[in-house]
Amino acid sequence: MTEYKRVFVDTAPLIYLLEQNLSYYDRLEKAFSSWYESGTEVITSAITVEEYCVFPYRENRMDLIENFESFLEGFGVDVFAIDEEIAKKAAWIRGQYPSLKAMDSIQVAVAEQKNCDCFLTNDKQLRQYSSLNCMIVDEMT
């Protein structure tokens, strides 16, 4: 696996990993283990927290939220808040790439502001933002 210094993780890969999705779990577990062992910094944003927690709150599954929080803490995932600078960067990104959704543009803005050298997602549409090195879960081996 390619060595990265800082990886941004989008919401879907975390859902796949934590729910042990049969199609994706093995490759994600391998990637996260490699990053952990090599000291790669893994980050995400408050958007991921919001997106992940919708289903557990809807279904009153506090165990899933506890598992999510334990994973973030145990793995040392840094969760970054959305501030005015990130909001403006996200607006600029949406202005340049109108097909990107607001949440996606915020995720991209956080990754860019935090100087991530990899963006782990399963959203191939994010590749259109060419200054971002997207790693697509479907294409991982």
Q: What is each residue range found by the language model?
A:
Residues E37-G39, G74-F75, Q96:
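Structured helix-beta-strand junction loops
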Residues L14, V49, A87, L126-R127:
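A generic structural signal for short hydrophobic patches within well-formed alpha-helices
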